[in-house]
C-alpha cells in the first residue's frame, strides 16, 4: 500500500507524538534531566495540537482501512491532546519530589496520548482494540508510579487485573461479530449486519460482550467498582488523565461505531444501554453524597457524567443532535475536570506527602488562596450544571435531546441525578468559604498562579465561564466536527 503526502498530512498529530516519544527516549538515554524531558514533551504535544490546522486542509480522508480523519476525529484528537498537556503540566511539580526515575512518566503519557489519537480516528475494530490497549497499558504504570505508596500500587494492580478481564470480553465480542459478519470495519459491519441479522443470538452475544468491555473502560454501572479506588490511589495528575483523555477517546470511538453499524437499532441493545445509563446516573450521584475524599467524589461523579452521555449514544442513530450533544458535553466535562483535578494537584505535596484529597484540606481555602478557591467554585458549579457555566450548556443539550427524541424516563433520570449532584458539589463549594482550622498546613506555593499548572487551571476556569455565557464558538466548532458517512 502506497501512502500519499495527503495521508501523511492527515496523520500529523499521531506522527508528531510518535516522534516525540522517540526524542524523549533518546534524551533520557543521553542524559537524565527532568526539566529538558518535560519541556520536550510539552513542545511535542503543542506541535501536535497546532498540526490539526494542517490536517483540516486535507479534508475527510481514509488514511488506511483502520483510520478515518475527518472533522469528528480532529475535534476529539484536540481534546485528548489538551488533556495530555494538562496532565504533563500538573505532573512536573509533583515529580520534582520523586526520588526515582522521573522522566519515564512523560514517555507513558505520550504513548497513552498516541492511543487516544488512534481511537479518535478509528474506523475499524482492529484500530479500536489497538487504541484501547495503547491507552490502557501505559496507565498501569502511571497509576502505580508512586509505587512506594501502598495505595498507588494497589490501585495499579486492581486496574491492571480488571482491565485485562475487560479486554478479554471486548476481544471475544469482536470475534463473535466477525464470525457472523465477515468484516471488522465499522462500515463493513453496517452493511453486513442487516436488520434481520441483528436479532441473531450470536450477534447479540457479541454486542453484549463488547458492551461489558467498553463499559469497564468508561466506568459504567455495573462495571465501575474500580473507579473510586483507582482515582484515590493514583497520583493527582494521573487521575486527571484517567478522568479526561481516556474517557473522551473511548467514548468518541464508541459513538462512531454505533453511528456506522446498525447495532443501536436493536431494541434489546437500546434497552440495555438505557438501563446502564439510569443505573450509572443514580449510583454515581448517590455514592458521591457520602464521600469525604475529593478524588473519590470526583470518581463517582465521573460515573454519573458518563451515564448522562450514554443518552446521546442511545439516540445517535435516530437523532442528529446526539453527536452535537456529546461534543459540547465532553468539552465542558474536560475543562471542568482539568480545573478540579488541577486544584487538587496544586494543593498536594510534591510526591513526598499525601495528596490534598480530604474535604477537610479545602475548608476555609478562600481566606488563604481566594483566587484558587474561586477557580474550584467555578469547576464545582460547572460539574453541577449551574447556569453561566459550560457544564450547564452540556446538561441543557442532553435534556433538549432527550425531550426531542422522546426518551422521557432517561431525561427524568438526568434531572433527578442533577438535583442529587447539586448537593455534594455545593457541599465542596461551601467548605471553601467556612472558617479555616488553625492547625491546617497548606502546601500550595504562594505564587501558584505563575506556575505552569496554575496557568492551565486559570485558563480552564476562564473557558468554563466564557463558553458558559457565550457558547456559540464551541457549538459552531462541534457542528463542523461531524463524521461524514
From Swiss-Prot:
Top EC group: translocase
Topology class, membrane: Multi-pass membrane protein
Short name of one Pfam family: Proton_antipo_M
One annotated GO molecular function: NADH dehydrogenase (ubiquinone) activity
Highest taxon above the source species: Bacteria
Keywords per UniProt: Cell inner membrane, Cell membrane, Membrane, NAD, Quinone, Translocase, Transmembrane, Transmembrane helix, Transport, Ubiquinone
Transmembrane segments: 10-30, 35-55, 75-95, 104-124, 125-145, 159-179, 203-223, 235-255, 271-291, 297-317, 327-347, 374-394, 408-427, 449-469
BP GO terms, sorted: ATP synthesis coupled electron transport
Chief location of this protein within or outside the cell: membrane
Catalytic reactions on record: a quinone + NADH + 5 H(+)(in) = a quinol + NAD(+) + 4 H(+)(out)
InterPro entries noted in UniProt: NADH-Q_OxRdtase_suN/2, ND/Mrp_TM
Location relative to the cell: Cell inner membrane
EC number: 7.1.1.-
GO cellular component, one term: plasma membrane
Subunit architecture: NDH-1 is composed of 13 different subunits. Subunits NuoA, H, J, K, L, M, N constitute the membrane sector of the complex.
Family recorded in the similarity comment: Belongs to the complex I subunit 2 family.
Functional summary from the UniProt entry: NDH-1 shuttles electrons from NADH, via FMN and iron-sulfur (Fe-S) centers, to quinones in the respiratory chain. The immediate electron acceptor for the enzyme in this species is believed to be ubiquinone. Couples the redox reaction to proton translocation (for every two electrons transferred, four hydrogen ions are translocated across the cytoplasmic membrane), and thus conserves the redox energy in a proton gradient.
HAMAP family associated with the record: NDH1_NuoN_1
Protein name in UniProt: NADH-quinone oxidoreductase subunit N
Protein species of origin: Yersinia enterocolitica serotype O:8 / biotype 1B (strain NCTC 13174 / 8081)
Gene (UniProt): nuoN
